[in-house]
């Protein structure tokens, strides 16, 4: 929830120091480091020291978690595309992309949006999306996974009933 043990600068320096000291370093990152992560910042910093980098990609939670629940991000006759957006910007404000997404016919995956849920729901309602099926999945694909299913109209109540959080 935005609480980090190390600053990004400390992580960058740790990677470089270990690469020089041990001949290599591995940065194992939870989530996709190139979707609202700092993967490119780390690579740029490390390569500025002449250190070769390699990325071993995984599958983004924005696709894997819905799939694990049988939720299709695109479906013939329903949704031709999907958007992955942040709910909360680095300045802790609601992303303006939420307004655009609410007007789209695309499936919308909102990461880091729980603290802005009330605002997000209001925006989708404003664009007549009250009955859109909605899922909130906390700690997806882990043993502590919690799932709340509803519509834009009901999802805030579902969050309270299921005690979902970010």
Where do the protein language model's features map onto the residues?
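Class I S-adenosyl-L-methionine
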Residues: 1-56, 144, 156
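Class I SAM-dependent methyltransferase SAM-binding "motif I" and its flanking Rossmann-like core
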Residues: 30, 34-104, 146-150
């Amino acid at each position: 929830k935005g609480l980090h043990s190390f600053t990004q600068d400390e992580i960058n320096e740790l990677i470089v120091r270990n690469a020089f000291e041990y001949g290599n370093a591995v940065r194992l990152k939870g989530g996709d480091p190139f979707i609202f992560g700092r993967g490119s910042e780390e690579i740029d910093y490390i390569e500025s020291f002449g250190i070769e980098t390699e990325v071993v990609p995984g599958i983004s939670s924005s696709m894997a978690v819905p799939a694990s629940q049988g939720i299709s991000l695109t479906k013939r006759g329903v949704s031709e595309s999907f958007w992955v957006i942040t709910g909360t910007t680095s300045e802790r404000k609601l992303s303006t992309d939420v307004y655009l997404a609410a007007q789209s016919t695309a499936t919308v995956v909102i990461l880091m949006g729980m603290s802005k849920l009330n605002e997000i729901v209001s925006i989708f309602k404003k664009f007549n999306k009250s009955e859109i099926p909605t899922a909130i999945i906390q700690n997806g694909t882990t043993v502590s996974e919690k799932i709340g299913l509803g519509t834009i109209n009901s999802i805030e109540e579902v969050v309270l009933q299921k005690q979902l959080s970010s």
